[in-house]
Amino acid sequence: NPALATGRGEIIEPQKPFAALKGKGLLLIHPGFGVSTPWAYQALAASGDYGNEGAAAAVLEALSAGRLDGLANSLEAPVFSKYTVLPVIKEFLADHGALVALMSGSGSTMFALTENRAAAEALRAQYHDHFGQAGWSATVSL
């Protein structure tokens, strides 16, 4: 079940299932390398580009109303500047049918939301045809 984590992740608020995610497919892609979580957060803090007040509430409202707008990850900017293949992967996913493509957490795993699991499987095959078999990938139904 979905939850909202706040603080340093220690405050967990269970949420009702989101209408926007019902029946969607999810593709996870790990490109074969990791990103240091402490480094990612330090780079974000140094940039000063974080902490959009009300953003989480707006995303929860959109998802509950059946919309996917507003999904974002502020850690993408510093991580993408160092690991330049990640924005290429994100763009590929968006250009090949993902409803939403984002980095998960501090990276390096990327994810794509699709209309259904079959679309996620097709996108997975296209990804591996284009980028090869390095890393791992998985699909699930939401």
Q: How would you describe each model-predicted region?
A:
Residues S108:
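Glycine-rich GHKL/ HATPase_c ATP-binding element in histidine kinases
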Residues R8-V100, E115-E121, A125-F131, G135-L142:
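Conserved, helical-rich catalytic subdomain that frames metal- and/or nucleotide-binding sites
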Residues F111-L113:
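Short hydrophobic/aromatic beta-strand micro-patches
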Residues A5:
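Conserved active-site beta-strand element of glycosyltransferases/polysaccharide synthases
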